[in-house]
Amino acid sequence: MRINGLYTPYWYRDVVDLLERASDRLDQIMIPKVGCAADVYAVDALATAIELAKGRHKPITFEVIIESAAGLTHVEEIAASSPRLVAMSLCAADFAASMGMQTTVIGGTQENYYMQHGENQYWSDPWHWAQAAIVAACRTHGVLPVDGSFGDFSDDTGYLSLIHISEPTRPY
């Protein structure tokens, strides 16, 4: 269940209401716009207190969404921030906005963002470096890296390409 971001006044009530009412039926909370480990600590401390007060038997787990330059800068400490953290993903649209990137397609390539080689233009992947940083932090700390969104529903080829490059590598 995705809660409101910690920059809003609503996240606290989201966590309290979810954990007090859902009992053990709820497995995971998705925390958006995580910018540093303290964001995860805040939700973890609140969740721990509620679980103890309510006698919850199954600890809730977290998936965090990296959506800002700050989040990517602190991705290593975020990945190590809590034993509840089991998954992490990148939100390309909000990340692009925080970076001041000119983007019109969520998760896809951008016009005029290419490498020129002679007469040929080769599209670059503007998200590769951010995704690679997230995957490295996740692999280091035993967290599952989850691919982010792809918002251009009219681009079947781009979507299939994203699926292909997102598949985990398999040993030969």
PLM features: what roles do these ranges have?
Residues 29, 78, 91, 134:
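Conserved, mostly hydrophobic/aromatic
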Residues 100-125:
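Glycine-rich tight-turn/loop motif centered on a GG-T
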Residues 1-49, 67, 71:
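Active-site beta->alpha loop and helix N-cap motifs at the rims of alpha/beta catalytic domains
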Residues 163-172:
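Single conserved hydrophobic/aromatic residue that forms the stacking wall/gate
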Residues 1-3, 27-31, 60-66, 86-90, ...:
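Hydrophobic faces of well-ordered beta-strands that scaffold small-molecule active sites
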Residues 63-79, 120-127, 152-160:
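Active-site glycine- and acidic-residue-rich loops that bind
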Residues 22-25, 49-58, 142:
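Short helix-capping segments at alpha-helix termini
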Residues 137-153:
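Active-site rim beta-loop-alpha module in soluble metabolic enzymes
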